[in-house]
């Protein structure tokens, strides 16, 4: 029974760590802080368009 409890706790910690890492990565991409090619492509495609820039101010820097 003790081994099962240890396994459950280990899986919960692993899941929490993986979820936190993914969440932080998404937040960085959404705020324009991630320098990866996907976020740059989205920003470059959206920011020149006034409607997209207005709907997504979190990815377009202020002018």
Swiss-Prot record:
Entry superkingdom: Eukaryota
InterPro entries in alphabetical order: Conotoxin_a-typ
Any one GO MF annotation of this record: acetylcholine receptor inhibitor activity
Keyword Disulfide bond annotated: yes
Main subcellular location: secreted
Cysteine-cysteine disulfides: 46-52, 47-60
Tissue/organ expression: Expressed by the salivary gland.
Subcellular location: Secreted
Propeptide feature: residues: 22-43
GO cellular component terms given for this protein: extracellular region; host cell postsynaptic membrane
Signal peptide: 1-21
Chain intervals for the UniProt region annotation (Lacks the Ser-Xaa-Pro motif that is crucial for potent interaction with nAChR): 48-50
The keyword Transferase appears for this protein: no
Keywords of the record: Acetylcholine receptor inhibiting toxin, Disulfide bond, Ion channel impairing toxin, Neurotoxin, Postsynaptic neurotoxin, Secreted, Signal, Toxin
Family stated for the protein in its record: Belongs to the conotoxin A superfamily.
UniProt note: domains: The cysteine framework is I (CC-C-C). Alpha4/7 pattern.
Function, in words: Alpha-conopeptides-like may act on postsynaptic membranes, they bind to the nicotinic acetylcholine receptors (nAChR) and thus inhibit them. Has possibly a distinct nAChR binding mode from other alpha-conotoxins, due to a different three residue motif (lacks the Ser-Xaa-Pro motif).
Protein name: Alpha-conotoxin-like PuSG1.2
Taxonomic source organism: Conus pulicarius
Lineage: Eukaryota, Metazoa, Spiralia, Lophotrochozoa, Mollusca
């Amino acid at each position: 029974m003790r081994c099962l409890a240890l396994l459950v706790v280990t899986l919960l910690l692993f899941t929490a760590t993986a979820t936190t890492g993914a969440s932080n990565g998404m937040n960085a991409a959404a705020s324009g802080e991630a320098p990866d090619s996907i976020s740059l492509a989205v920003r470059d495609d959206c920011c020149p368009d006034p409607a997209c820039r207005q709907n997504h101010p979190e990815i377009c820097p202020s002018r």
